[in-house]
A protein has these predicted regions:
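Serine/threonine-rich low-complexity intrinsically disordered regions
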Residues: 2-5, 18-22, 148, 159, ...
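Glutamate identity and glutamate-enriched acidic tracts
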Residues: 5-8, 50, 98, 131, ...
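Terminal amphipathic alpha-helical/low-complexity segments used for targeting or macromolecular assembly
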Residues: 1-72, 183-192
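Intrinsically disordered, low-complexity regions enriched in small/polar residues
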Residues: 5, 19, 89, 106, ...
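Conserved beta-strand-loop-alpha-helix hinge in the C-terminal portion
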Residues: 166, 171-186
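Left-handed beta-helix
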Residues: 72, 77-78, 83-84, 89-98, ...
Length: 192
């Protein structure tokens, strides 16, 4: 990841919270929004991790990042591949596998688990598309493909692939409509 890519990812994240990219808005969100502050440090640690020139700063950045992980209950690794526009509206109990892939402009609500399955026919890691809304308490694990603009309902356990623009609900998750995430995803800045 290059510096300008880091800047684009952070700008896209900030835009999801504020709806604009003014510096004052970004600074205000950094101060008042735990979700944006965490995603900023997560992306910064990921950038430092990939550049050996900056490895000397990684332990210091990691301390701040880890403190925010513990304080707000975010279990999202800085090594995870997440597109720009990550929106964390609530904190507490969000766990994402370090090898999961999450697209651009996605919402992760509280108590979401996106995990890897190490055995069985679903062995693998989830791949989440762009503009996906994942509701509170949802669980997605294994080699699951979640299509673009899908919505996963609260407490839904996803055990099979989710088509594009589908709305999943229940345990195990079933498609209940094809209205997608349009009403849940706001302030997108394109695909970063």
């Amino acid at each position: 990841m290059r510096y300008f890519e880091l800047r684009e990812l952070i700008n896209a994240d900030a835009y999801r919270y504020t709806g604009n990219n003014r510096l004052t808005s970004r600074l205000a969100q950094f101060i008042i929004s735990p979700g944006f502050r965490f995603s900023w440090w997560m992306r910064f640690c990921g950038y430092l991790h990939e550049h050996t020139v900056w490895h000397i700063l990684l332990p210091l950045a990691w301390l701040v990042y880890h403190r925010l992980q513990v304080k707000f209950g975010y279990g999202i690794s800085y090594k995870c591949k997440i597109g720009g526009g990550l929106y964390l509206p609530h904190y507490g109990g969000i766990n994402v596998s370090e090898i999961a892939h999450i697209g651009s402009n996605c919402n992760l609500s509280q108590l979401v688990t996106i995990g890897v399955s190490r055995r069985g026919e679903m062995m693998g890691v989830p791949v989440i598309g762009d503009e996906v809304y994942i509701g509170p308490g949802a669980v997605i694990f294994g080699a699951i493909q979640v299509g673009d603009r899908a919505a996963i309902g609260a407490n839904c356990v996803v055990t099979k692939d989710v088509p594009e623009s589908a709305v999943m609900a229940g345990v195990p998750g079933k498609v209940i409509s094809y209205e997608g995430s349009a009403g849940y995803i706001h302030n997108t800045l394109g695909r970063a």
